[in-house]
C-alpha cells in the first residue's frame, strides 16, 4: 500500500503585540485612609545597628550578648536534636588575622585547635558544657567555640562562641 500524503492547512498566527492592557480585569482598590494608618515606626525605634568599630563579629550568634548557661544548653540541645556531632575548638586569638602573608592560609586564624575528639554519640547537652568548663580551666585566656558537624554530609552546620576570655576587647564590654 502506498503512503498517502495529507495536505495540512496553514494557520496564521498573529504576531506578538506586547503586553495587553489590564483595564479589562477586575481590580480591587483600597482606600487611601487605611494605608495611611499602617506604620512600621514601632519596629524602627527598636532596631539597632552593629557598630563598625570596637566590637568584632565572631560566629553565628555574635550579635547577641554573651550566652547564659541556659541559652548554651538550648543551643547544644538543638544541635544534638538535629543529629549533628558536637565539637569544641579553642584559640588564643578569636578572629581571623593575617600576620605573615596577605593571602589566606592555614595559620590565619580560621582553623582553631580542636579540644579532644568530636563528641560522637553525645546525647546530653550538659556533657558538652562540662567539656567547655574543662577547656576554660585549662586555657582561661582562650576563646571557646562549639561546632555542630553533620557527619553524613561532611559539613559544619553551626558554629558559635561559647566563651570569651575575661577582659577581651571584642566583647563590647570594655
UniProtKB/Swiss-Prot annotation:
InterPro entries: RuBisCO_ssu, RuBisCO_ssu_dom, RuBisCO_ssu_N, RuBisCO_ssu_sf
Principal place of residence: plastid
A GO CC term attached to the entry: chloroplast
Biological processes annotated in GO: photorespiration; reductive pentose-phosphate cycle
GO molecular function terms noted in the UniProt entry: ribulose-bisphosphate carboxylase activity
Keyword Chloroplast carried by entry: yes
Subcellular locations according to the entry: Plastid, Chloroplast
Feature: transit peptide: 1-45
Sorted UniProt keywords: Calvin cycle, Carbon dioxide fixation, Chloroplast, Photorespiration, Photosynthesis, Plastid, Transit peptide
Chloroplast in keyword set: yes
Family as reported in the entry's similarity comment: Belongs to the RuBisCO small chain family.
Record's subunit section: Heterohexadecamer of 8 large and 8 small subunits.
Note: The basic functional RuBisCO is composed of a large chain homodimer in a 'head-to-tail' conformation. In form I RuBisCO this homodimer is arranged in a barrel-like tetramer with the small subunits forming a tetrameric 'cap' on each end of the 'barrel'.
Role, per record: RuBisCO catalyzes two reactions: the carboxylation of D-ribulose 1,5-bisphosphate, the primary event in carbon dioxide fixation, as well as the oxidative fragmentation of the pentose substrate. Both reactions occur simultaneously and in competition at the same active site. Although the small subunit is not catalytic it is essential for maximal activity.
Name of this protein: Ribulose bisphosphate carboxylase small subunit, chloroplastic
Lineage of origin: Eukaryota, Viridiplantae, Streptophyta, Embryophyta, Tracheophyta
Gene: RBCS
